[in-house]
Amino acid sequence: MKHVLCAFIVVALFALTACDNKSTPTAHAPTSQNFVDVASTTTKPTTQTANAQAIDCQAITNTLTTIDASSQIDDFDKVDKLLNHCLPTVDNATQIKWATQYQLAYQRFLSFWQGDTFLFDDVEFNQLNQVMYDIHYHEKYDESDIAKLPPKAQHLIKQVKQGKLKIANHCEGEFDFNNDYQAFAKLFTPHLPKDQAVLIERLASDNQEPLWCDAGFSVSLDELIQRALFWQDYQKTYPQSVFINDAKHLSLFYEFLLFFGSENTYWLNDDKTEFITYINENDETFTDEASFVKLAKHDSELGKKAGAYLEFIATPKDERDEKYPINPANLAKRDLNNTGQIEDWERATLQLMTALGSTRADVPNCINAPICLPASDEP
């Protein structure tokens, strides 16, 4: 996608790893592709045993690893049929490998890049973005507008209208295509152990819509709290899960978002001495303090940190240097040699990190997909 999908955490506290998008090179001409919508065929039903014997399950990996931006949705339809027969017959490591390969294949398929070449010119991309806007917001649009799009774009829009793909709204008029994460979960989770099924079902639910919206959050504070609590509880419920490290990463990530916010979503003033007051549509004033007070009463590690958070806010600024000395490790990550180089707002953030025992949390490869993905496209 030509735009950058993710704007990140306050004061550049995160080392962002989630987005691989590139800027659109206007010098490149769009690549010509042929996209033909293949009608689904009806196969004669046979028993699972017979099909398992007849089907080469290795074809799953071979097909998934060759799918790219020039492929068609029909390739996934074929893989789905293979998976339905083969998933019950293989070990868990292979099941996870296929699930990962499947999502990576979808990401390549939905990409607007073919190698180093962007598939649309600026005019075509803007036309596509407008159609995606109209469909997402249920606005009226002319079918002729779709007919004017390049074949690749027409193919993807058709799959959206048929319910096979979703349009993701990144705000500020920027959109993306996603596969249906609930369909992903329905395909894989019946064959997985409970801990793995629970994780995938949760990610499918949380991640279908983007977390980020114009350098802020698309979800409420209370939703962030629920996500942070979920991943904390997951670690206690499934300590031996093969996904335990992913759960730990997600727990730290959402905890950090909860207490530190983002560039355009935050709960405290710069000095972190009081909650920001908002005015709702009825001209009523409110703050987010009640959510943290409620969380502080929760019998959990997150609840204890919420209590420490409220205590920090109540601590006068002139007492914080002694009570909450800045962790040198956090200072070093900011490439600062001493506290004298720190702005007041940044000092408050670093002191709050001390109060909560927090460090910076990288964005996990688990917030844009129904499964945590490897850092490279090589599962």
Functional labels for PLM-detected ranges:
Residues T31-G173:
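N-terminal Sec/ER secretory leader and immediately downstream segment
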Residues A15-A18:
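C-terminal motif of bacterial Sec signal peptides marking the signal peptidase cleavage site
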Residues Q58, F275-P379:
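Hydrophilic extracytoplasmic domains
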Residues T89-A93, G115, L119, K186-K194, ...:
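Short solvent-exposed coil/turn linkers within tandem alpha-helical repeat scaffolds
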Residues H138, D142-H170, N179-I225, L257-H298, ...:
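Short coil/linker segments at helix-helix boundaries
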Residues D20-K22:
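Bacterial signal peptide processing site
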Residues K2-I9:
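Sec-dependent signal peptide recognition
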